[in-house]
Design a protein with these regions (language model features):
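Metal-dependent amide/peptide-bond hydrolase catalytic core
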Residues: 2-194
Length: 194
């Protein structure tokens, strides 16, 4: 943008905050919750004083997607929005950093899930499958072709909010299930070696 006094000659300024605000509206329109593709503006900062047209502003955007193809498409769409100036004379610089690849099903994932379901039944523990936009180190493991299931820890909810909670009662049963699955995997590995 370009700084200018907000009271004396605001027309000479180019407001970087307004530029981001206009881009945010377009970025928000990219959300496709059914598909699992989301764009979240996590932080925004700009300007130096209320009486000065903001010369600069910055924001952090979080992108989530379920497949690599959806991720590539979403990144292209975001890039197109960022590269288009909404206010004449304002320039946008951006950097993409990848945090985690999407958690994908690989060969062996279905068999691993069946083991978890069987252990849940044997122990009388409810087992529900769900697709979320959450991530873990498991995303990296799945990305290299290792069967991975995420979300087997204790029950909780309202993540990243003041109301976030954890059900302590669920920890024992979840540990038991994990122990059962790991034990079965060990037995399968022993059978495979003999």
């Amino acid at each position: 943008g370009r700084a200018a006094h907000a009271g004396i000659e605001p027309e000479k300024g180019r407001n970087a905050i307004e530029e981001l605000a206009l881009k945010i509206v377009k970025l928000r329109a990219l959300n496709d919750f059914d598909r699992g593709s989301t764009v979240t503006i996590g932080t925004i900062n700009g300007g130096e004083n209320r009486i000065v047209v903001a010369e600069s502003a910055e924001m952090d955007i979080d992108l989530r997607y379920r497949t690599k193809e959806d991720g590539e498409m979403l990144i292209r769409q975001v890039r197109d929005i960022l590269e288009q100036a909404e206010i004449h004379g304002v320039r946008t610089e951006y950097t993409f950093t990848r945090n985690r690849p999407p958690l994908v099903q690989v060969e062996g994932s279905a068999q691993l899930q069946r083991l978890v379901e069987e252990a849940s039944q044997e122990l009388g523990i409810p087992y529900l499958t769900a697709v979320t936009g959450g991530v873990s180190d498991g995303n990296f493991v799945a990305d290299i072709g290792t069967p991975t299931i995420d979300g087997l820890g204790p029950v909780g909810g309202m993540m990243c909010s003041p109301e976030e909670y954890l059900c302590l009662d669920s920890m024992t049963e979840r540990i038991a299930r994990m122990g059962t699955v790991v034990g079965w995997l060990g037995c399968l590995a022993d059978v495979g070696r003999s």
